[in-house]
């Protein structure tokens, strides 16, 4: 199933599988969350179906002690990611870059997740930017989108304004702090 450590000529899928499992074991040993890019990829001509988060299901099952932080809400597979985050305790939704990809998809996903996913499994903001301006702009967009989604749930009567504020803080601060083992933040 895996390449042996003493094999020098490990190529193609065997090598990819070996490296993925090596990194999962490494993350498990060190209690480090494993971040994976899914969904829309920067640039053109990517095969989007290769980034479907369901392709990772075997890893979620095999490495139950590894927390997987799934980037970009898996867009356009955000509904699938909802189901994965609901059924796997070790799968977290990361909204990094997603607010830029599609603000509407983010708001709609958050409204859905409030009904279907433990909200302490959602990181509301993050990014892998090449320039600092992206951080400020994306955070502003994230705050607006989270506010819109939570306001919808308040209007529906799912929770009150104070609970919405607590949930917002949890998604922006508490969940990432816990997931990444940040103590003095």
Language model features with spans:
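Active-site gating/metal-coordination segments in enzymes
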Residues: 1-33
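Alpha-helical packing segments of well-folded alpha/beta enzyme cores
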Residues: 19-23, 109, 171-175
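Hydrophobic alpha-helix feature that most strongly marks membrane-spanning transmembrane helices
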Residues: 28, 61-64, 86-89, 111-118, ...
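Catalytic core of soluble alpha/beta enzymes
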Residues: 33-86
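Short acidic/histidine-rich active-site segments
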Residues: 35-37, 69-73, 96, 119-140
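Histidine/acidic-residue-rich catalytic or RNA/ligand-binding cores of hydrolases
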Residues: 44-53, 78-87, 103-111, 132-148
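C-terminal structural cap/anchor segments
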Residues: 72-124
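Mid-to-C-terminal alpha-helical segments outside catalytic/metal-binding sites
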Residues: 119-120, 136-185
């Amino acid at each position: 199933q895996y390449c042996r450590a003493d094999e020098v000529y490990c190529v193609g899928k065997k090598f990819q599988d070996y490296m993925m499992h090596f990194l999962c074991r490494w993350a498990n040993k060190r209690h480090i969350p494993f971040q994976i890019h899914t969904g829309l990829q920067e640039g053109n001509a990517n095969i989007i179906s290769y980034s479907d988060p369901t392709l990772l299901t075997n890893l979620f099952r095999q490495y139950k002690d590894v927390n997987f932080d799934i980037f970009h809400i898996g867009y356009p597979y955000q509904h699938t990611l909802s189901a994965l985050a609901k059924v796997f305790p070790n799968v977290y939704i990361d909204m990094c870059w997603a607010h830029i990809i599609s603000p509407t998809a983010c708001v709609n996903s958050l409204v859905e997740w409030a009904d279907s996913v433990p909200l302490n499994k959602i990181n509301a903001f993050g990014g892998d930017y090449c320039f600092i301006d992206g951080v400020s702009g994306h955070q502003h967009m994230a705050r607006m989108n989270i506010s819109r989604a939570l306001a919808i749930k308040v209007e529906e009567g799912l929770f009150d304004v104070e609970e919405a504020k607590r949930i917002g803080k949890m998604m922006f601060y508490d969940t990432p702090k816990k997931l990444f083992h940040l103590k003095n933040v």
